C-alpha cells in the first residue's frame, strides 16, 4: 500500500508539468535575451571595429544593410554614407566600406592577398561539398564571378584570355552591325513613342550576344519586347543581395532548400515565375549544347577515320562559340565542362552588365541635350551621318555606314560621355567586398583585423572629390578630356567600372565593342529624349545595379 502511495506521489500532475514547461521556457527566453544583449554590447562597444563610425544598427546586425539592399536603396547609401561618416564606415558587424585612394590600393592592389568575401556564396553556380571542419569545397566548373580559389581563377583567365582579347573580339563586329541595323529599323517604326529604356537596351544586348556567341537571334527586336526576362533576372539580384549578407544562412541553404525558401519569404525576396514566361537561357543552352555535342563527336571521329571533305553546310559559323570549341580542342586544360559553362557565361555575365551600361549612358546623354549635341557634331565630323540624311535636293548623302570598333576610339567626346555615365551609375551597386588577409589592414589611422570584410562601393568611390574633382557628383564628360594627365590617370586608376585588381571583367573587350558601337549608332539615327528620369529613391539598385524606371523617346533624325 505504501509502495502504491509512493508511486502515485512520484508521478507529476498535469499542473506540475505545465509549470515545468513554463519555467524552462522562461529560462530559455531569459538566456536568449541575455545572450542577445551581451552580443549587442560586444558588437557595439567591445568589437575590434567598435571605434569605426557608422549607423548604430549596422554594428549590431547585417539586417541593417540587408534591409536597404532588399529595398533597392544601395544607390542612396553609396551617395550618402561616406558623406555623413567619412572615408571609413562600418556597415555590418564585421564589414567596413572605405572610400579613398589609399584604401583602394590596399584592397585591390595586385598580389595583396585580399580574396573574395563570403558575400559571393550567394552567387555560386554549384553546390559545394563540406568537410568535417565545415569548410566548403566547390567543384572546378569555371564559375568566374564566384571562384574563391585564386590559383584556379588565374588559370581560367589565362585559358580564355586570348579568345576575349580585343583583336579577336573585333572580328565579330559584323554580327553587332546587323543587330544595330535591325534595332534602328524597328525603333523607327515606333515614330518617337515612349519606351522603357532599360527593356530596349536589354533587347539590343541579348540580340548582340546571340549574334556574336551563337549566330542566333531570340527574336526580341521584331517582337519589341524581351518577354520580361530582364525584369525577372534583375529580381534574382535582389535576392542574392540579401542572402550575400548572411553567409551562414546561405551556406545552410546549399543543403536545405526549405530553409532557403523560408529565409526568402521572411525577407520578401521570393518571386514567382510569371505565367508563360520563357527565359532566353533555355534556347541558349540547347543551341550551344547541340553545337558542342556535334563538334565533340566530329573530333572523336577524326581520331578513328579519315576526315571526309567539308561541305559548305558543315563549316562552323564565325562566332565566339566556334572559338571556344577550337580552344577546347587545342588545350586539354580547357575541359569540356569549362567549354559548356563558358558558352552560357557569355550570356549570364553579359546580358545584365551591358544592359546596365547602355541604360545609364543613354539616360545621361538623353537628359543632357548639350552633351548629345556635341556627340552628334563629333559623329558628323567623322562622316557618321544618319542613314536618312539628305541634301537640299533630297538626295541621300553618303556617309560611313557602320562605326568600326577601332575607329570608335577616335570619338573622344562620345567615349568620354560613355565613361562618365558608367562612373555615376556603375554596374556594381554594393561594395566589391574582399576579406582582410592575415597581415591585417591599417588605413586612416585604424587597424582592421584579419577576416574582416572590406571593400569600396563604386557608387561612393566614383563620387570621391579627391579623385574626380569638386563636381564629382555631376555629369561632366569633359573631366575625361582635361589637360591634366595625372588627374586623368588617377580617374582611370581608382575606378571600379570593370572590377578591381586581379578580378576585373574577363569580357571587358566584348562589352566595350558592343557599347562603343551601339551608343554612337543610336545617337546618329535618333534624338534620344528622356521623358522620365526617376530620383535616387525610386531607382532600384542592388549588388548588380541598373538605372531602373527611365522612360525615353527615340525620335528619328531627318
From Swiss-Prot:
Region (Disordered): 298-317
GO biological process, one term: antibiotic biosynthetic process
InterPro entries: Cyt_P450, Cyt_P450_CS, Cyt_P450_E_grp-I, Cyt_P450_sf, Cytochrome_P450_monoxygenase
Record keywords, A-Z: Antibiotic biosynthesis, Glycoprotein, Heme, Iron, Membrane, Metal-binding, Monooxygenase, Oxidoreductase, Transmembrane, Transmembrane helix
Top-rank lineage group of the source organism: Eukaryota
EC number: 1.-.-.-
GO molecular function, one term: iron ion binding
PROSITE patterns registered for this protein in UniProt: CYTOCHROME_P450
Cell compartments where the protein resides: Membrane
Pfam families reported in the protein's UniProt record: p450
GO cellular component, one term: membrane
TM annotation in the entry: 21-41
Top EC group: oxidoreductase
Function as written in the Swiss-Prot or TrEMBL entry: Cytochrome P450 monooxygenase; part of the gene cluster that mediates the biosynthesis of sordarin and hypoxysordarin, glycoside antibiotics with a unique tetracyclic diterpene aglycone structure. First, the geranylgeranyl diphosphate synthase sdnC constructs GGDP from farnesyl diphosphate and isopentenyl diphosphate. The diterpene cyclase sdnA then catalyzes the cyclization of GGDP to afford cycloaraneosene.
Stated name of the protein: Cytochrome P450 monooxygenase sdnT
Organism: Sordaria araneosa
Amino acid at each position: 500500500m505504501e509502495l502504491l502511495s509512493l508511486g502515485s506521489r512520484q508521478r507529476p500532475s498535469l499542473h506540475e508539468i505545465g509549470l515545468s514547461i513554463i519555467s524552462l521556457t522562461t529560462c530559455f527566453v531569459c538566456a536568449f535575451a541575455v545572450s542577445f544583449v551581451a552580443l549587442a554590447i560586444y558588437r557595439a562597444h567591445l568589437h575590434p571595429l567598435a571605434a569605426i563610425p557608422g549607423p548604430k544598427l549596422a554594428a549590431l546586425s547585417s539586417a541593417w544593410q540587408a534591409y536597404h539592399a532588399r529595398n533597392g536603396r544601395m544607390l542612396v547609401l553609396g551617395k550618402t554614407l561616406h558623406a555623413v561618416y567619412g572615408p571609413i564606415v562600418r556597415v555590418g558587424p564585421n564589414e567596413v566600406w572605405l572610400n579613398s585612394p589609399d584604401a583602394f590600393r590596399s584592397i585591390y592592389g595586385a598580389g595583396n592577398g585580399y580574396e573574395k568575401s563570403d558575400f559571393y556564396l550567394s552567387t555560386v553556380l554549384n553546390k559545394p561539398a563540406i568537410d568535417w571542419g565545415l569548410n566548403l569545397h566547390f567543384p572546378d566548373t569555371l564559375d568566374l564571378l564566384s571562384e574563391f580559389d585564386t590559383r584556379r581563377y588565374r588559370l581560367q583567365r589565362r585559358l580564355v584570355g586570348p579568345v576575349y582579347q580585343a583583336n579577336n573580339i573585333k572580328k565579330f563586329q559584323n554580327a553587332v552591325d546587323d543587330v544595330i541595323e535591325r534595332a534602328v529599323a524597328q525603333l523607327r517604326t515606333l515614330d518617337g513613342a515612349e519606351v522603357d529604356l532599360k527593356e530596349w537596351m536589354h533587347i539590343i544586348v541579348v540580340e548582340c550576344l546571340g549574334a556574336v556567341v551563337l549566330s542566333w537571334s531570340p527574336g526580341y527586336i521584331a517582337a519589341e519586347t524581351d518577354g520580361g526576362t530582364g525584369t525577372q533576372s534583375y529580381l534574382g539580384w535582389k535576392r542574392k543581395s540579401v542572402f550575400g549578407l548572411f553567409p551562414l544562412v546561405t551556406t545552410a541553404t546549399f543543403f536545405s532548400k526549405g530553409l532557403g525558401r523560408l529565409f526568402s519569404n521572411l525577407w520578401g525576396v521570393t518571386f514567382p515565375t510569371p505565367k508563360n514566361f520563357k527565359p532566353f537561357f533555355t534556347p541558349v543552352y540547347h543551341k550551344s549544347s547541340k553545337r558542342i555535342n556535334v563538334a565533340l563527336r566530329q573530333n572523336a571521329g577524326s581520331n578513328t577515320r579519315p576526315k571526309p571533305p567539308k561541305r559548305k553546310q558543315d563549316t562552323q559559323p564565325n562566332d565566339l562559340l566556334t572559338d571556344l570549341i577550337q580552344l577546347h580542342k587545342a588545350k586539354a586544360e580547357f575541359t569540356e565542362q569549362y567549354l559548356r559553362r563558358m558558352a552560357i557565361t557569355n550570356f549570364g555575365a553579359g546580358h545584365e552588365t551591358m544592359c546596365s551600361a547602355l541604360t545609364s549612358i543613354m539616360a545621361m546623354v538623353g537628359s543632357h541635350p548639350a552633351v548629345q549635341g556635341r556627340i552628334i557634331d563629333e559623329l558628323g565630323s567623322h562622316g557618321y551621318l544618319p542613314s536618312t540624311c539628305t541634301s537640299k535636293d533630297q538626295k541621300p548623302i553618303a556617309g560611313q555606314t557602320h562605326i568600326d570598333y577601332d575607329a570608335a576610339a577616335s570619338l573622344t567626346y562620345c567615349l568620354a560621355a560613355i565613361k562618365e555615365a558608367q562612373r555615376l551609375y556603375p554596374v556594381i551597386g554594393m561594395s566589391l567586398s574582399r576579406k582582410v588577409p592575415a597581415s591585417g589592414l591599417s588605413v586612416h589611422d585604424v587597424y582592421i583585423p584579419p577576416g574582416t570584410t572590406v571593400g569600396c562601393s563604386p557608387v561612393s568611390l566614383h563620387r570621391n572629390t579627391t579623385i574626380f574633382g569638386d563636381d564629382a557628383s555631376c555629369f561632366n564628360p569633359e573631366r575625361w578630356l582635361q589637360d591634366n594627365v595625372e588627374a586623368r590617370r588617377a580617374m582611370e586608376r581608382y575606378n571600379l567600372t570593370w572590377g578591381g585588381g586581379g578580378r576585373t571583367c574577363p569580357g571587358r573587350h566584348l562589352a566595350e565593342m558592343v557599347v562603343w558601337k551601339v551608343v554612337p549608332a543610336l545617337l546618329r539615327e535618333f534624338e534620344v529624349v528622356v521623358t522620365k528620369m526617376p530620383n535616387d529613391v525610386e531607382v532600384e539598385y542592388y549588388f548588380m545595379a541598373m538605372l531602373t524606371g527611365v522612360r525615353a523617346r527615340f525620335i528619328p533624325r531627318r
